[in-house]
Amino acid sequence: MRNSFCIFFLLWVTLDVYSGEKCLFTIGSDFIVTDTISKNLSDTSRIFNLSDVVVKGSNIITKSDRLILIPTSNMQKASSSAWDLLSKIKLPGVIVDRQNKNATTINGSNILFKINNIDATIADFLTIIPSDVKKIEFFDKLGARYNDSNISAIINIVTKRHTSGGQFGLYEDAALTTMSLYNSAYVKFNKANSLFSLSYNSKYRDYSNSYTDTYLENEDVEISRKGVESPYGYFLQNIDAAYNYYKNNFTFNIKFNYSTNRNTNQNCSQEIFDKKSLIGNSFRSPKDKSHSPAIDLFSEYKISSKQSLLFNMVGKILQTNYDYSYAENVNENNSHFEYGVEGKRKSLITEIMHTYSLKNLSWDSGLRYKYSDTHNLYSYDITNDFDSKDQNLYAYTQFSGNVKNIYYMGGIGINWVSFKEGGNSFNKVLYRPLGRIKYMPLDNFSMSYQFSMQPTIPSLSTLSGITKNLNRYEFETGNSALRPYDNIKHKLSLSWNPNRWYISLNYNIESAKNLFASGIYCQNGKSGYQHINFDSKTVRKIDFYTSFDIIKDMLFIDGYISYNYYKFKIEDETFSLTDYTYGGKIVFYLKNFSANISFNHNPKELFGMKSFYGESTGSVDCSYKYKRMTFSLGVWNPFKKYVQSSGFEYARNGLYKTEYFRIKDNANMITLGVSYDINWGKSYKARNKRLNNSDNTDGIVK
């Protein structure tokens, strides 16, 4: 009798914690069949098998298409926000860059952030109080809706809600050794079925010790340019105002956004050498200003307990002023090149989606239409104009379900893309099939295979026929003959979560034929850069991730390593690259104190004849939480003379070009952070907005 009561109690607690979550539901267009539920109710590894409920001593739960990570109360007590919480929880294959306020996958792919299934930003994560975070969902195998994007993973934070009262918070992160500031402020009010919110965030940089080193070699010249320390800075601002209304089976959401960007202090001075002899100097000064208002409308009508109809519309206007000035003196001969461009881009995205779910089967379908109109007016040394119109109609459908412990998903997307600029135009239909099968013989072990075909569409800048002189030795130009091509992707995955360990292994293969990529050639003694057509490409990536709880819920260590291989072929030429990336962190938290030591060596990436170099980072930081305030102190990139922020390399027979941008201010940077938050009100679980679109293309050909 006593044992029966204990089992009943555990079952009741588990179902209560998940508040009716044992059902079919959707996230975006990814249908999820709720399967075995695990909850960290004790530190033991004892398992109670209660129908389809499993209670186990781990806060990492493996689902059919995602991981669920449950933050412990100790993690929440030691964190200042949901963003801070991300660095204390084990996200397999995710690099959390605390300094630059960003997160990517091991191989550098983009991650989409969400809060309660609504598209969000890192600034939004800073507005979430840790105690309001119920769970963190991590998706690294996405469905048909995202098969036309460059998103490879999703981090969704599920939070508590408030029906009355409100929330207010401030966040400030400043460097003590240089001028680097990050500011954030927000306020939220709830009244009956309505929620009002207003937020502001900005990022300001004003460095004095940055420089760029370049080297150029072709058939006629061998020029190296040694960077002279120059100022580097920018100022980004973002304002959001939102209103949400929910009653019964209807939800309405409207969001206004206004963002500005000022890059007016990014000068580059260089000394020019012909082989080893100093022959002159150069000065480059790009300036960029932009502002963008946007509006996002969303509504959802729940037809029945099994069906929903959703609608989303996003409108955006982007205006940009860009000026590029270059001057050099070589052997007492002066030359100067300058151009300006005033750009305006108007875009509209509309989407409608229908969802339907049964006991062991889910199905959804949607239609999304994008339209954009871009105008670029050039001045000074470039007299061409660039006016384009592009359209994209994407229809998708997907089903998913399970048979016992085998989970399956299949879907297809069909694209119609249209582009017109002057006399150049194309219309093309693209197909985006995908499928996935996952086998879970144990609740803590899974293996899966996923296939997808993702077409790549050329950007506006690569299609532009405008030629721009970079200096007397180099130029770059667009290629109006480029056309979309198909990427074939395969992914094999294994994951195992025994007691204190978590282990994952992924093998990715990507291939394409008749594609376009970066190229270099020589014309009249000058090196030219242009996207050109290649015959084929092959990409192989193997990444391994592991984490271990040294002291459970207090001290853990994780690490990753990735092998990356690229090969591109054009006629009888082959370009290849093999590279490794690795990193890890040690995290300690106890009561209101936490400490974090991390390092990340970013990978190189080959795209045709051009290799890209990312920024490798390291940090040591700690924080202490006192009532509603949190104080943090950190050292970023310790024991370094400089930080290589970015770089690239072109290589071809007889042609070579390298460029490395380095910032001394980012080395040994000491930062101080202060945050304050307060909230009041009662909690409730609101309906989730599940459709989100945005136009992140600037459309300005620089």
Where are these regions (language model features)?
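Outer-membrane beta-barrel translocator/receptor signature
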Residues: D148-I155, T163-Y211, Y234-Q237, N249
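Short acidic/polar hinge/loop motifs at secondary-structure boundaries
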Residues: I118-G143, A185
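Surface-exposed extracellular loop regions of Gram-negative outer-membrane beta-barrel proteins
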Residues: S418, D443-H490, Y507-K526, F639-L655
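Outer membrane beta-barrel strand-and-loop segments of large Gram-negative receptors
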Residues: S347-I349, S388, Y394-Y396, N479, ...
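Short, acidic, small-residue-rich periplasmic hinge/interaction motif at the N-terminus
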Residues: E21-M75, Q99-N100, D140
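Face-selective signature of the C-terminal outer-membrane beta-barrel domain
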Residues: L236-N263, S285-N424, K428-L434, K438-S448, ...
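N-terminal periplasmic accessory domains that precede
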Residues: N40-S42, D52-V54, A82-L85, N102, ...
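Extracytoplasmic beta-strand/coil segments of soluble accessory domains associated
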Residues: W83-I118
